[in-house]
């Protein structure tokens, strides 16, 4: 029994480490401006790139310069496009392993490398036409068709701002919570914090889609909120 317990603990530790073993990740290759770019470490299991890519190929690596200790996160499928809805990758030290393909030069590529599930999701980001805030902390509550419209930046269509009151409303469900939607209803487009009940004043990360986590107020007040949809960042401040 003790041996079985120890075996289970070892297996569990291995699973936990698999999502945390990469301290940093890079992309290198002909498709990468400047030849190499460091990925943003959003969490222990999520590395992200948002920016320009050229026509060519790229490799996801553990080092900026390829050497004997470099590991490659190479696609399982041959000729894998960086734009995809989730493709599996495997880890190798083989410098001749398959690369990710970029077939169109664009300024707004965005992809996530998930180290826990060993998948890469990529897209050419298209600016949204609308963005709303809704929830128990807003005056309109959780009602579809009543959410508050954010203002799109004229010079950068990926930037949205909103200023207004957020406070706890005791007479509604989840009275201090809120989130952002790409339309004046709950589906299909939405953005969420990485963790439930995140304080928007303390964490500037957000993710597109996924589980229905929400922001929760730590203080009532008049808020000014700016969202960068492309870079998946949010900045909030209390103005009064």
Pin down the residues of each PLM region.
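Residues within well-ordered beta-strands of beta-sheet-rich folds
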Residues: 50, 110-112, 132, 163, ...
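Eukaryotic intrinsically disordered, low-complexity regions enriched in proline/serine/threonine/glycine
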Residues: 238-240
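Positively charged n-region of N-terminal signal peptides that target proteins for export
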Residues: 1-4
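Hydrophobic h-region of N-terminal signal peptides that target proteins for export
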Residues: 9-18
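Short tyrosine-centred short linear motifs in exposed loops/low-complexity segments
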Residues: 96-119, 174, 211-233
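Aromatic-rich carbohydrate-binding modules that target alpha-glucans
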Residues: 21-57, 63-88, 125-172, 183-207
